[in-house]
From Swiss-Prot:
Protein name: GTP cyclohydrolase 1
Keywords of the record: GTP-binding, Hydrolase, Metal-binding, Nucleotide-binding, One-carbon metabolism, Zinc
Organism: Aeromonas salmonicida (strain A449)
Annotated SUPFAM superfamilies: Tetrahydrobiopterin biosynthesis enzymes-like (SSF55620)
PANTHER family listed in its UniProt record: GTP CYCLOHYDROLASE 1 (PTHR11109:SF7), GTP CYCLOHYDROLASE I (PTHR11109)
Pfam families: GTP_cyclohydroI
Pathway: Cofactor biosynthesis; 7,8-dihydroneopterin triphosphate biosynthesis; 7,8-dihydroneopterin triphosphate from GTP: step 1/1
Length: 218
């Protein structure tokens, strides 16, 4: 079993304590065993749909889907893939908002297992620590690579950054298109969903909140 980083352990514990962890049931399967089991189930699903798995276009599809689930789009279920995080002392004494806008994210709706496609915007006010900017993107992408609901995803990113930075002063906003709305059901191709999660002064100070929300425009 791969040992988890201290950062991964801290973030997971914080999410569990706040009831924000993705619903999970522990099992003893390793990655290869998961892929083999998923491949078998996917083969059965495709056969049930009447698809001919002897056709060269379909023959490898169960294997491809299993590999994609475990190694890619659901890799965020495995904390051994939690990004290596660089947090450094705030020697420059930065005390103004740092904002990273338009972080691309692709997730999967946990209700229908279809795509959520959107952008995340992250801001924080440094206290004792600052984080490498690319690490913010990687943390967003880690939590997106799970079956998700957008509300939980937003809060998970917030709490992870609060935990790693040692400050409540973090704000997250996500704007996303849900293909469970766009490609099925109501078939609405133009609507999107916005969720926001605010901590610390972003929640308690109207001017700081307005600065963050204003930074989302344009």
């Amino acid at each position: 079993m791969t040992s988890l980083s201290q950062e991964a352990l801290l973030v997971r514990a914080a999410l569990e304590a706040e009831g924000l962890e993705t619903p999970l049931v522990a099992n003893a399967l390793n990655g290869q065993q998961k892929k083999e089991k998923i491949e078998g189930h996917m083969r059965a699903i495709m056969e049930t749909l009447g698809l001919d798995l002897t056709d060269d276009s379909l023959a490898e599809t169960p294997h491809r889907i299993a590999k994609m689930y475990v190694n890619e789009i659901f890799s965020g279920l495995d904390y051994s893939t939690f990004p290596k995080v660089t947090v450094i002392e705030n020697k420059m004494k930065v005390d103004e908002m740092i904002m990273v806008r338009d972080i691309s994210l692709t997730s999967t709706c946990e209700h229908h297992f279809v795509t959520i496609d959107g952008l995340a915007h992250v801001a924080y006010i440094p206290r004792g620590k600052v984080i490498g900017l690319s690490k913010i993107n990687r943390i967003v992408q880690f939590f997106a690579r799970r079956p998700q609901v957008q509300e939980r995803l937003t809060q998970q990113i917030l709490l992870a950054l609060q935990t790693l930075l040692g400050t409540k002063d973090v704000a997250i906003s996500i704007k996303a298109t849900h293909f469970c709305v766009k490609a099925r059901g109501v078939m609405d191709s133009t609507s999107y969903t916005t969720t926001t999660s605010l901590g610390g002064v972003f929640k308690t100070q109207p001017d700081t909140r307005a600065e963050f929300l204003g930074g989302l425009k344009g």
